[in-house]
Amino acid sequence: MGSKMAILILGLLAMLLLITSEVAARNLKEAGEAVQETNEVADAKLVAAGEAVQETNEVADTKLVGAGEAVQETNEVADTKLVGAGGVVKQRNKVGYGKLVGVGGYDYGNWNGGQRSPYGTGAICMRGCCFPSSLGGSVSCCPHEWQ
């Protein structure tokens, strides 16, 4: 009777072990599917984030292009202003000692007026600020000389 009881207990333990292993396998399979679903969601989010980053970069690139154009326009305006300001040397900006002051033109420091440029020919500028020619003469006086 003791051996029958031992066989019965061993059989029950074997069945219990079989059921436990099947439940564990099913749980493992479900956990694997859950992990796979999580990865699919994460991948979808990463793809969406990648597209959002790409769109953000496209917007940023557009803004940079726009900013570059604005900078270019500003430089064109600045260049235009510099071109328009060429040769203007205001009396109040003079430093003296014949130094070049302002944008363009040559100031020879003739503060008393009526002096010919050091080139000796061409225009006689009241304050000595003129534009020299390539031949050595004075082409014209600076605009503030006309006032």
Curated annotation (Swiss-Prot):
Family label: Belongs to the GRP family.
Annotated compartments: Symbiosome, Peribacteroid membrane
Main location: membrane
Transmembrane regions: none
Cellular component annotations (GO), alphabetically ordered: peribacteroid membrane
GO BP annotations, alphabetical order: nodulation
Stretches forming Sequence repeats: 31-48, 49-66, 67-84, 85-92
InterPro entries reported in the protein's UniProt record: GRP
Signal peptide bounds: 1-25
Induction / repression: During nodulation in legume roots after Rhizobium infection.
3.5 X 18 AA tandem repeats as annotated region, ranges: 31-92
Protein name: Nodulin-24
Keywords from the named record: Membrane, Nodulation, Repeat, Signal
